[in-house]
Amino acid sequence: MIAFVGLGNPGKEYEKTRHNVGFMTIDELSKKWDIPLNQSKFHGQFGTGFVSGQKVLLVKPLTYMNLSGECVRPLMDYYDIPLEHLKVIYDDLDLPTGRIRLRTKGSAGGHNGIKSLIQHLGSPEFDRFRIGIGRPQNGMKVVDYVLGRFSEEEQPDIASAIQASVEACEAALTKPFLEVMNDFNKKV
């Protein structure tokens, strides 16, 4: 089984915010793959299905971003999913808005959701789909920025990035992740 986890914050007030691009991507995968997120356990909303011959788990932790590991670790244990089958989708301040970057492991890079996952999983060695949200301008606080919504000008770039992330997730079902990473990291 391959687990795709989108990071975000639960609740209407956080829908479509920069910090929730992981949730938005999981919602798109759910539609495209016809896997309803109709199960709830371990402080998460999730669904399972088969895509390209692979059993798939789609997850949206409902713990708030900074506690994502509290949902993901128990689900990984429950379904006996090895760390190399975990794919995490999240926002990244260090990438320009609309850009995606895949990587196989690394530090949290200041992202509290990733920090929680590393802490609870006991390892930073899991595949990541980073979606660029850019950096705040004009002295805006980071917390206000990530919890804000995309501007009208940013909407097309984010829609493209989410679509590219969906395509990368699909490719990761049938190709080695390093190959997928090389293919998608080249795209602008």
Swiss-Prot record:
Lineage of origin: Bacteria, Bacillati, Bacillota, Bacilli, Bacillales
Residues forming coiled coils: none
Keyword Cytoplasm tagged: yes
Binding site for tRNA: 14, 64, 66, 112
Record flagged with keyword Transport: no
Subunit field text: Monomer.
Protein name, as recorded: Peptidyl-tRNA hydrolase
Site feature: Discriminates between blocked and unblocked aminoacyl-tRNA: 9
Gene transcribed to yield this protein: pth
Pfam families linked to this entry: Pept_tRNA_hydro
Superkingdom of this protein's organism: Bacteria
Catalytic activity entry: an N-acyl-L-alpha-aminoacyl-tRNA + H2O = an N-acyl-L-amino acid + a tRNA + H(+)
Record-annotated site: Stabilizes the basic form of H active site to accept a proton: 91
Role summary: Hydrolyzes ribosome-free peptidyl-tRNAs (with 1 or more amino acids incorporated), which drop off the ribosome during protein synthesis, or as a result of ribosome stalling.
UniProt EC number: 3.1.1.29
Any GO molecular function: peptidyl-tRNA hydrolase activity
Family: Belongs to the PTH family.
Localization: Cytoplasm
Principal location: cytoplasm
One annotated Gene Ontology cellular component of this protein: cytoplasm
Active-site positions on this chain: 19
